[in-house]
């Protein structure tokens, strides 16, 4: 991919920033989710930091998860800077990746479609059937905005933030 982008845009730093920021955002989100569960305290809802939520709740954030998100973003930023030789990318991509991850949490806590499994008595993203095989009931959010679209939006938001930081928009 490095060579294909370089062929079409050899001296355009914004292309590299956008590409790396999309990867940084989704990596940051993955690290936040996977490592955030290690936080000793329960997460808080991103839209109301006084509201305690269960681990794994869409829109829930924690200190460990947020730091993991920053680390995941910084790793991609470091690799992008190393591969391009342009160390000014590091801060832009790190910030954009973290912002994308937080945007993912914001969407998850506000408008992402969430469902309820009457058998397990749990909130879930699964629809029409929960993993136990029970039909889920819509609780909140826009029914068309599933977790896949939220994840895609995370990457796009990272790109937009990187371009804003570079002054492209």
Task: List the predicted regions and their residue ranges.
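Hydrophobic alpha-helical transmembrane segments
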Residues: 1-169
């Amino acid at each position: 991919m490095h060579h294909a982008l370089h062929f079409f845009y050899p001296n355009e730093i914004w292309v590299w920033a956008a590409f790396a920021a999309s990867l940084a955002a989704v990596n940051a989100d993955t690290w936040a989710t996977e490592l955030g569960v290690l936080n000793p305290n329960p997460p808080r809802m991103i839209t109301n930091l006084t509201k305690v939520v269960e681990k794994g709740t869409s829109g829930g954030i924690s200190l460990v998860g947020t730091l993991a998100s920053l680390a995941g973003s910084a790793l991609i930023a470091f690799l992008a800077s190393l591969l391009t030789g342009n160390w000014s990318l590091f801060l832009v991509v790190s910030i954009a990746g973290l912002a994308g991850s937080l945007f993912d949490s914001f969407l998850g806590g506000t408008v992402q479609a969430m469902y309820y499994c009457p058998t397990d008595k749990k909130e879930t993203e699964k629809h029409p059937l929960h993993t136990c095989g029970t039909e889920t009931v819509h609780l909140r959010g826009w029914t068309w905005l599933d977790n896949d679209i939220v994840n895609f939006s995370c990457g796009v938001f990272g790109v937009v933030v990187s371009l804003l930081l570079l002054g492209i928009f």
